[in-house]
Amino acid sequence: MDAMDLSQRPPRKPRAELGGIIFLPRSIDKARAHRPGGDPGPYVLRGFTQHMLDMLGITQEAFVEVVAVAASDDDVLTSILARTSPEQIATWNAWVSARQPRNGDRVAALESYPWLGERPDLQLGLDVLEEDDNRYFAART
């Protein structure tokens, strides 16, 4: 897959799914941005992406290589499904769907995302990441 520039726009939304795997499209975008010629902007492969890979039993190196040689998202999905089980996917999806920022420590979350004080309705990490994307790119325009 071609490199991607995430300095100009965010990766796909945190709740986006591919093949029933939450966060996979976003992680693909981040891996593409780390390819030669790409620009990851503020995005890294640790964090949720690393948790996803760990829970699916895939190394970061293997994932980056799969994305590099894939022609499409479906190619990445085929490779992921060959390396993981439905149980691992279900465990990941349940974990990420319930995950709170900074393990539920609101004070620590406020240190990372000071604007959370204005948004007490955002309790889940996926929602916080989406709002953080929105705020980051709104501030750049």
Question: What is the role of each PLM region?
Answer:
Residues 13, 53, 81-85, 126:
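Alpha-helical interaction segments
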Residues 89-92, 112:
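Intrinsically disordered regions, especially transient/low-confidence alpha-helical propensity segments
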Residues 24, 60, 73, 77, ...:
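Short amphipathic alpha-helical segments that mediate assembly, nucleic-acid/protein binding
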Residues 38-80:
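Amphipathic alpha-helical packing elements
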Residues 2-40, 49, 96-141:
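Polar/charged low-complexity regulatory segments
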Residues 71-90, 97:
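Charged interaction scaffolds used for protein-protein
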Residues 57, 65-70, 75, 92, ...:
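Generic alpha-helix signal with a bias toward terminal, lower-confidence helices
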